[in-house]
């Protein structure tokens, strides 16, 4: 059987060739009609008014059935709907679809602000964004699991939610579940205490998309890891999409079961690095437009230069500046932004950062000791962390070069300068190093 449009065109041509139908009648009744669908041998046809429907019913149905049979060898029955009725049906369907989507979104705990439309793409997240889009188009096929890793406030959660929203937009019936690793753990514990493990399994294994945030917190939780392993297996074997986030690669998560590490690496792991200056400016501009606030480009650049750690701090700074402008009843300028960040103590947490704090964070991050950082060992696994610690000490504290050298076991100030310059230069071309430094800055400037 031809598709309904081809069939309609053939039927319409037959009416046009019918000697018993005048051109005026053809133009008034047939030409103005429009096919909508063909299901179960019923062709739904849209007509201009109830008058047109009555005319078709009284004068044209028999010939329609005859012409349709000529082309299909089947009995096709027309069903007419007026223009107004069609619009009403469309509006009702649209409202129902939106209602279903809203209900689905509420059930999934997705944040309505975190969509692909509101995500600002930059060099540090370009690949992650592309992978997220690909997974949205073909869930469970290309990259499963999809594993985002990087420091806090860089957009991992945003992309995760965007995937969920996109799948629901594609099909409102998609079963999406977003959960933090902590919430998953709590649900699991509660299910055991209340003897509701079957309900727990139904909740997490009967979905099309599972989004789990901050899986590094599964570390040290043996029973939870065991449960998540079986949840992962059930979804993966059913070709359901899994998306995970962490602050580090799977194999860098301490005390994570080897079989989970292995499965987390089955798909695609992508790091998200701190945004560069251009991306930070774009993020601020996007937020200003969303908030309908006018901010000069030079002011946006000033803010972007002040905050270089993560998106969360950028948005926090923007919120502070807008609030300050309202209090002052003044337009936002660079001077006002400077006053706002100073008067609201933005960035004052830097004054609390000390060299010992930096040494402690760096040592834990790279799994070395503070003594190693202060010592003279020349292994690469120690030299790089030592140079990063010196770089951060100069970047995040007001300490003099000699003071920094003293804190690192009596190093000469030229050694500190060399370390700072080396790391600064490498940051421009080494994405992994940029991610590591960004992670440490985020931890030091919560």
Curated annotation (Swiss-Prot):
Keywords: ATP-binding, Cytoplasm, DNA replication, DNA-binding, Lipid-binding, Nucleotide-binding. Residues 326-446 are annotated as: Domain IV, binds dsDNA. It is found in: Cytoplasm. SMART domains: AAA, Bac_DnaA_C. One of its GO terms (molecular function) is DNA replication origin binding. Belongs to the DnaA family. Oligomerizes as a right-handed, spiral filament on DNA at oriC. Plays an essential role in the initiation and regulation of chromosomal replication. ATP-DnaA binds to the origin of replication (oriC) to initiate formation of the DNA replication initiation complex once per cell cycle. Binds the DnaA box (a 9 base pair repeat at the origin) and separates the double-stranded (ds)DNA. Forms a right-handed helical filament on oriC DNA; dsDNA binds to the exterior of the filament while single-stranded (ss)DNA is stabiized in the filament's interior. This is Chromosomal replication initiator protein DnaA.
């Amino acid at each position: 059987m031809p598709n309904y449009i081809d069939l309609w065109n053939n039927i319409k041509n037959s009416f046009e060739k019918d000697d018993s139908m005048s051109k005026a009648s053809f133009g008034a009744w047939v030409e103005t009609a429009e096919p909508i669908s063909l299901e179960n041998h019923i062709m739904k046809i849209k007509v201009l008014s109830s008058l047109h429907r009555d005319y078709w019913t009284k004068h044209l149905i028999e010939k329609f059935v005859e012409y349709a049979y000529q082309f299909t060898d089947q009995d096709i029955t027309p069903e007419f709907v007026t223009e107004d009725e069609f619009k009403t049906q469309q509006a009702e369907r649209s409202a129902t679809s939106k209602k279903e989507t809203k209900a689905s979104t509420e059930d999934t705990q997705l944040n309505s602000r975190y969509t692909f439309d509101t995500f600002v793409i930059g060099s540090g997240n370009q690949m992650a964004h592309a992978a997220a889009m690909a997974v949205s188009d073909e869930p469970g096929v290309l990259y499963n699991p999809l594993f985002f890793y990087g420091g806090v406030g860089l957009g991992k959660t945003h992309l995760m939610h965007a995937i969920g929203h996109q799948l629901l937009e594609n099909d409102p019936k998609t079963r999406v579940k977003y959960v933090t690793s902590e919430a998953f753990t709590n649900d699991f514990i509660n299910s055991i205490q209340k003897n509701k493990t079957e309900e727990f399994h139904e909740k997490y294994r009967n979905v099309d998309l599972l989004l789990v945030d901050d899986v590094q917190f599964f570390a040290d939780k043996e029973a939870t890891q065991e449960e998540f392993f079986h949840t992962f297996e059930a979804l993966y074997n059913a070709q359901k999409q899994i998306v995970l986030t962490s602050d580090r690669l799977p194999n860098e998560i301490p005390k994570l079961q080897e079989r989970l590490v292995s499965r987390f690496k089955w798909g695609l792991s992508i790091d998200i690095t701190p945004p560069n200056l251009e991306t930070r400016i774009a993020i601020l501009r996007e937020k200003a437009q969303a908030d309908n606030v006018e901010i000069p480009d030079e002011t946006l650049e000033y803010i972007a230069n002040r905050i270089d750690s993560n998106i969360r701090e950028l948005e926090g700074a923007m919120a502070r500046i807008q609030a300050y402008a309202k209090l002052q009843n003044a337009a936002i300028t660079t001077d006002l932004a400077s006053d706002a960040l100073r008067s609201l103590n933005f960035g004052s947490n830097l004054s609390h950062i000390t060299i010992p704090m930096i040494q402690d964070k760096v040592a834990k991050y790279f799994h070395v000791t503070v003594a190693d950082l202060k010592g003279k060992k020349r292994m690469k696994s120690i030299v790089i962390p030592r140079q990063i610690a010196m770089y951060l000490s100069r970047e995040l504290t007001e300490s003099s070069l000699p003071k920094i050298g003293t804190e690192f076991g009596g190093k000469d100030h030229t050694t500190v300068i060399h370390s700072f310059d080396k790391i600064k230069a490498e940051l421009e071309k080494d994405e992994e190093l940029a991610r590591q430094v960004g992670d440490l800055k985020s931890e030091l400037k919560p």
